[in-house]
Amino acid sequence: MVQPRFVRPTQSSPSSISGEPNSSNLYVANCGPAVGLTHNAIAAVFAEFGEVNGVYAADDSGVRVIVSFADPFSAKAALEALSGRPCPDLKGRSLHIRYSVLQLPSETQVNDCVPVSLIDSELNIPGLFLLPDFVTVAEEQQLLAAVDARHWIGLAKRRVQHYGYEFCYGTRNVDTKKRLGELPSFVSPILERIYLFPNFDNGSASLNLDQLTVNEYPSGVGLSPHIDTHSAFEDCIFSLSLAGPCIMEFRRYSVSTWKASTTDAEKSGDSSCIKKALYLPPRSMLLLSGEARYAWNHYIPHHKIDKVKDKVIRRSSRRVSFTLRKVRNHPCSCKYPQYCDSQQQM
């Protein structure tokens, strides 16, 4: 959900006591969707005092909103007329109103200053493709309902489900001798659509994806930088984003080994790595193949908010990803030996 972020003015800000309005934005408590008042209905009432740019949820309660006017004098007029009084046009509710100011998150809170692209071609990473609206809203709800009806495995900060083969986080690999069975039927439509993936020339007709990991990320939880172990999976990795958006950052280090990064310096990146970031909207499918799969770390910052171009995007309460892969049954012989566990061990 894209929305501005508002906070209470500081004590040093001009106040209404001085006779001058200090903001064109009002924090309004005791009204909202949770008590049967839509944002449009609220906007119509406040529009009597001036042009309303928008009405936004102030938090997740459903009973507190931000009313943003085009100018501060309209906000002042509305505050003086409505605050502390029952409003007949809003079901007679008494409104509690104060000024609010717009505040963008600090640079350290959003994307670590890495510019975010909206389309895959802007990154210029060979083998990386993003297809928006890969599934419909109805299909998204069906997929979420299907996994929510099944058993989740709790990890430290997220929940997972494994199908086909279990992914072992300790070794970052799979045990090919312990197959869990066929992939569930609810992913069949996804598999059929994957074989028609645009720009996919890696033998899709013969690709037999046989491993699925479903991850549920609460708001603010991301993913540490890593390259999927070369010996564990074949070339193509597909990741479907559901329920919420995120920023995925890609990092290529000038010096690297196949071992998973463990130090804080490696996790945060350093001057020897190239960083690029891509916005993954809900219902989009990401394909990592070739160089993108074998040589670039992928990473989801641990943020509750992200900055995309000039907009601040608040992450939803959950994001669910479906990652589909083909288990490898032979050593990897890719063109990127410095990142390859198979070739490093030869």
Swiss-Prot record:
Cofactor(s) for this UniProt protein: Fe(2+)
Cofactor note: Binds 1 Fe(2+) ion per subunit.
Keyword RNA-binding: yes
Enzyme class: oxidoreductase
RRM domain boundaries: 24-102
Sequence segments annotated as region (Disordered): 1-21
InterPro entries membership: AlkB-like (IPR027450), AlkB-like_sf (IPR037151), ALKBH4 (IPR032857), Nucleotide-bd_a/b_plait_sf (IPR012677), Oxoglu/Fe-dep_dioxygenase_dom (IPR005123), RBD_domain_sf (IPR035979), RRM_dom (IPR000504)
PANTHER family in the record: 2-OXOGLUTARATE AND FE-DEPENDENT OXYGENASE FAMILY PROTEIN, OXYGENASE-RELATED
Designated name of the protein: Alkylated DNA repair protein ALKBH8 homolog
Organism: Arabidopsis thaliana
